[in-house]
């Protein structure tokens, strides 16, 4: 929403698609492409559903590339916020993932609450009913008490808090193992904390893995964690990992950010 080039290119493609496929309505997934869709739709006046997967303008404030020197020059979360409000007012209906997100949106934008539908995150049935157990993962942790974290490991995800609790945890759980499946640019700092606390034997950094392996990690775990820090984004959205854990019957420890607190 800083430069119009993407909108111009994509709107032309979308307009061609609408015209040649007899489209009757449009469903826009998240804010990134919304401007292109609305721009293309001027010629057709179709009903548009704007599906907001998250509070993107808010979470962008925490992105490393947005906070870099070039990012601060080229990317404006404020302009994204203005765009979000503009297209929410233009949309025929809006989808958000929590009641808290609906409440926040209606409180910020003068729109009828009947236009805002809550449709929560979920996992596909095949994730928990049609997976193949990877015995290598299961055997690797068969003798450990596994605390599992799935997903992005950036600072706002709260793993630093978990790492700093390990010296106390291992006093009572001798076979404890924190297994982190995911990564981010913050990993070097997490690795430094592990080294400083001398807890390397209790932490496995697995990096990103194919989602097909997630059920095996979950089945190997005693507890799944979601230690998110509180902010306007985390307080109004759900982490997918919560539903992945629960779908396979894995107990969950979560932080008290509002959305997680209400869910669990």
Question: Where does each model-flagged region fall?
Answer:
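Conserved donor-binding/catalytic core segment of Leloir-type glycosyltransferases
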Residues: 95, 123, 139-166, 179
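Acceptor-binding helix/loop patch of EC 2.4 sugar-transfer enzymes
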Residues: 1, 49-82, 112, 126, ...
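Glycosyltransferase donor-sugar binding loop
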Residues: 150, 177-191, 207-208
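Carbohydrate-associated surface elements
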Residues: 100, 122
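Nucleotide-activated donor-binding/catalytic signature segment of Leloir-type glycosyltransferases, i.e.
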Residues: 188-215, 223
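Nucleotide-sugar-dependent
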Residues: 157, 206, 212-217, 224-246, ...
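Nucleotide-sugar donor-binding and catalytic loop/hinge architecture
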Residues: 130-146, 171
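Membrane-proximal helix-turn-helix segments that form the acceptor-binding/catalytic region
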Residues: 8-19, 35, 39-43, 56-58, ...
